[in-house]
Amino acid sequence: MAKKGKKYLEAAKAVDPTKQYTPEEAVDLLKKIDFAKFDETVEVAYRLNVDPKQADQQIRGAVVLPNGTGKTAKVIVFAQGDQAKAAEDAGADIVGAEDLVQKIQDGWLDFDVAVATPPMMAQVGRLGRVLGPKGLMPNPKTGTVTMDTAKAVKDIKAGQVAYRVDKAGIIHAPIGKKSFDADKLLENFKAMNDIVLKARPASTKGIYIKSLALTATMAPGIKVNPSDF
């Protein structure tokens, strides 16, 4: 494990590890922990009472944050005909079909999100071994396999965040930048929290959110009380 720096350790002293903060307190505290020399990404981590090995508990989806993420994603679209033109008009960075599949097979991966129309998935499926492990494979659950390529591109450019529960039952998701006003971070936090709550599997019994933390790239985790939303 990497050794924590002196500034990080000093910042950690401001956080009470035994306390569950309200969302407002957590955001205010996080913004006060400011020693990084860049605009840090703010993230949330939900530890859920789910078993990702069960098909009905593999939580995955996407949400458009009301205030965006602070980053404009580079979007590629696998489409032809009208859907290709619609994607271009909506602001897609690169649109292609077989040529784009080949480009990725040749090693090009300079993009953040991939969208595909259903008819293109037979060809895009060949990229599974490359895109799958990187979380870049188009998927209907995240709205990235669709005939409405224009909406998909616009949503992603507007700050759509894809999320999925990992093998440990945790969802990690960005909700903005440290430079955001506190109220904007809170609005994004609430939007993410709402979507996680709506994704609760019917088969989950008892407590759903086991723990929740707010953090940033160079900041310690701050425990948040899920009941305070």
UniProtKB/Swiss-Prot annotation:
UniProt subunit comment: Part of the 50S ribosomal subunit.
Keyword DNA damage in annotation: no
Record's GO cellular component terms: large ribosomal subunit
Keywords tagged on the record: Repressor, Ribonucleoprotein, Ribosomal protein, RNA-binding, rRNA-binding, Translation regulation, tRNA-binding
GO biological process entries: regulation of translation; translation
Protein name in the entry: Large ribosomal subunit protein uL1
A molecular function GO annotation: structural constituent of ribosome
Stored SUPFAM superfamilies: Ribosomal protein L1
Pfam families: Ribosomal_L1
Domain of life: Bacteria
Signal peptide: none
Source species of the chain: Lacticaseibacillus paracasei (strain ATCC 334 / BCRC 17002 / CCUG 31169 / CIP 107868 / KCTC 3260 / NRRL B-441) (Lactobacillus paracasei)
HAMAP family cross-referenced by the UniProt entry: Ribosomal_uL1_B
Family: Belongs to the universal ribosomal protein uL1 family.
Function: Binds directly to 23S rRNA. The L1 stalk is quite mobile in the ribosome, and is involved in E site tRNA release.
